[in-house]
Amino acid sequence: MSKIIGIDLGTTNSAVAVLEGTESKIIPNPEGNRTTPSVVAFKNGEIIVGDAAKRQAVTNPETIISIKSKMGTSEKVSANGKEYTPQEISAMILQNLKATAEAYLGEKVEKAVITVPAYFNDAQRQATKDAGKIAGLEVERIVNEPTAAALAYGLDKTDKDEKILVFDLGGGTFDVSILELGDGVFDVLATAGNNKLGGDDFDQKIIDWMVAEFKKENGIDLAQDKMALQRLKDAAEKAKKDLSGVTTTQISLPFITAGAAGPLHLEMALTRAKFDELTHDLVEATRQPVRQALSDAGLSTSDIDEVLLVGGSTRIPAVVELVRHETNKEPNKSVNPDEVVAMGAAIQGGVITGDVKDVVLLDVTPLSLGIETMGGVFTKLIDRNTTIPTSKSQVFSTAADNQPAVDIHVLQGERPMAADNKTLGRFQLTDIPAAPRGIPQIEVTFDIDKNGIVSVKAKDLGTQKEQTIVIKSNSGLSDEEIDKMMKDAEANADADAKRKEEVDTRNEADALVFQTEKTLKDLEGKVEEAEVKKAEEAKEELKKALEGEDIDDIKAKSEALSEIAQNLAVKLYEQANAAQGEAGQATDAQEAPKDDNTFDGDFEESK
């Protein structure tokens, strides 16, 4: 069975891992980095992903960041003269990670396990699965990020019984999960979180502070300047990271803007104390989900054996201190918070292929599921933290006499009234025979698969007529839309490969021209004029081809010059050897006996 890669598709950074033997290994990207920025940019029709996209973000307005925060919504982003869904942009990141894995493994990769925040709802999970499909990946499993982290941590500890609290604060989402490990079973007891809280929010607090301070000093609002704002974002992210290791950091942005008197520079010192003050409400927002998860699991802090920190934002000292205070435990530092999720996803891939034995993953649904009933009430069929996959049925009836149809309004959330919860979808069961209210028996069944994706069935028990839907939110893509996006993505991949080949061909041709010029200089006056002229002509033809767009012509001219250059190089080598030989003979001729009175003989030491 082919390899199943593990992908952590993050808000700010993503990572890809693969199982090698029994060990999960992070695959570095072509730049040698173990994580790849979740950044996509468009420039001159070209799609740029990762480190290269992040580097040019300041000067390129067509740069898209933190697309994960839009997954599961109908919001689109405009770039490159068209509109893209969050799934399409995410697919570009996934394609990049897929290519990284293929280059490392030396084989085609078609299957993946992709992680999502534990608190992702059905629409967000479906969008993630669609993104994988667009990228040319069969998504074997969607795994919750904290669960994947626990899997990576506990794989070599399957003989121990432990209860683990995973505190996962990433770039854009926050989750807390509590798991029980024992005999190879990873059982999620409870999960809680906030899909709108992460490292980006901490960055924004610093940006807002810098903008306010600069406006106070100079009367200019940097928030209105897109290029300045991108520089502020980069500086804020760096300052946040710096303050995890030092108590003061200097923010220096020369020529940030211009005033009436000329260019203006931004110079500010940010202390950790000030940073803690600015972000106090964000840190506090993580406290309640920790308590909620413990309460839902029916545990106290004394029952927790280990606390794992996941996500780059857990390096913030105030966050670590809050975790310490809430759990009465020193967080476990044995896992890399940026890499552990992808590693866990790769392990789950190994479980699916059978390479990892005796490991069972029991995940849960993060939010309650149900339908709207009379009076706008939310009636739950499946409670939050129910182990998945699962199925639950309940019988309802009509609310009016001779009602011919029922509308099924499917919801996800915890609030008592339907209007306050997340709508997953609506469908209708029709042709109900005329009868007084309360007589027809309508059975509603919820199914949640191992990926946390919901399907709902309504059945008239009297007529046995039924209607089933796999939930698609407003952002859900049809199979036709996904197929079209897949074709577009494949075309982009082919175009990218062609573009890379063109660049490589041009670079090799440039290098050949340079090397030929150097060789001709070294051979000046040492070879026949006809050979030099032949090389010069071939070199000029290649230079002329490089000015055009015909790649096949560049290849042909390169091959012609390469052959001539090789012959010249052989001549240069032969001449160098001949010169060395002559020099050696001259040295031998110059050497003479130093003492004609020397003689051979035996001697005996006298004692």
From Swiss-Prot:
SUPFAM superfamilies: Actin-like ATPase domain, Heat shock protein 70kD (HSP70), C-terminal subdomain, Heat shock protein 70kD (HSP70), peptide-binding domain. GO terms for biological process: adhesion of symbiont to host; aggregation of unicellular organisms. Belongs to the heat shock protein 70 family. Changing residue 596 to A: In strain: LM0230. GO terms for molecular function: ATP binding; ATP-dependent protein folding chaperone; mannan binding; unfolded protein binding. Induction: By stress conditions e.g. heat shock. Residues 578-607 are annotated as: Disordered. Gene3D superfamilies: 1.20.1270.10, 3.30.420.40, Actin, Chain A, domain 4, Substrate Binding Domain Of DNAk, Chain A, domain 1. PANTHER family: HEAT SHOCK PROTEIN 70KDA. Acts as a chaperone. Pfam families: HSP70. The keyword DNA-binding does not apply. Changing residue 537 to D: In strain: LM0230. Keywords: ATP-binding, Chaperone, Nucleotide-binding, Phosphoprotein, Stress response. It comes from the Bacteria. HAMAP family: DnaK. This is Chaperone protein DnaK. InterPro entries: ATPase_NBD, Chaperone_DnaK, Heat_shock_70_CS, HSP70_C_sf, HSP70_peptide-bd_sf, Hsp_70_fam. Residues 598-607 have a biased composition (Acidic residues).
